[in-house]
């Protein structure tokens, strides 16, 4: 006979369980932190970091910033923050590549989840001060007014990886050989991101076309060159 999971809290959270909901609300109202002692002891023992250093400025961080701006969100909670990047399940190698980059940036393994009844994976990680260290505000991305950091814009390798993150997230490449039509497009409704992509492509010597919700490369030579430059849809796990 199959054993059934009879855990007393199965299917509940502290806010929905009939016995815990009232207690949780009381703690919240009185601002009681029942984990404070444990957290302080964990910091002293090194189990929880007392502080979080700035991220190393390298190609992994540049890629992650671009990817987060394109397909990610940073959520703020009372005692932590959560970076979550949503990726199409038809690109499993991109999911693995992104998880590997996050692991290198954070020195911590992220959680990869398949979203039920969807064609989507999420790659996520919890840690304090994610937003301030990435330089990306928490909350809705569509209204975000982002300025590209100088350490990225002034370094070709970092700029290339930043653009790779953006194009892997929101880019599309189409080639119609009978008419010799080439289109490498970055589509987004955020005006500041479109301006950043336009400026970055020009810094690298390209001639982008600007549309209301997209920035495009249309010249055959530039499309082929840029695809190779950013290794678009080519994923080799970084050592």
Give the role of each language-model region.
Residues 1-239:
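Internal intein/HINT superfamily modules and their associated LAGLIDADG
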């Amino acid at each position: 006979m199959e054993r059934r999971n009879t855990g007393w809290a199965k299917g509940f959270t502290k806010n929905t369980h009939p016995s815990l909901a009232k207690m949780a609300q009381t703690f919240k109202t009185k601002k009681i932190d029942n984990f404070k002692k444990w957290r302080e002891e964990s910091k002293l023992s090194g189990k929880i970091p007392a502080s979080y250093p700035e991220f190393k400025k390298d190609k992994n961080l540049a890629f992650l910033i671009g990817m987060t701006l394109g397909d990610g969100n940073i959520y703020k909670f009372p005692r932590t923050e959560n970076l979550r990047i949503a990726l199409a399940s038809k690109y499993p190698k991109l999911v693995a590549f992104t998880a590997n980059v996050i692991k290198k940036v954070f020195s911590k393994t992220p959680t990869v989840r398949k979203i039920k009844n969807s064609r989507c994976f999420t790659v996520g990680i919890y840690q304090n001060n994610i937003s301030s260290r990435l330089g990306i505000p928490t909350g809705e991305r569509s209204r975000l007014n982002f300025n590209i950091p100088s350490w990225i814009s002034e370094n070709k390798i970092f700029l290339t990886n930043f653009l790779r993150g953006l194009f892997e997230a929101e880019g599309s490449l189409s080639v119609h050989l009978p008419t010799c039509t080439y289109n490498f497009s970055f589509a987004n409704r955020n005006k500041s991101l479109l301006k950043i992509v336009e400026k970055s492509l020009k810094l690298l010597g390209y001639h982008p076309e600007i549309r209301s919700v997209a920035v495009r490369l249309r010249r055959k030579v530039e499309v082929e060159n840029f695809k190779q430059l950013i290794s678009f849809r080519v994923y080799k796990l970084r050592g």
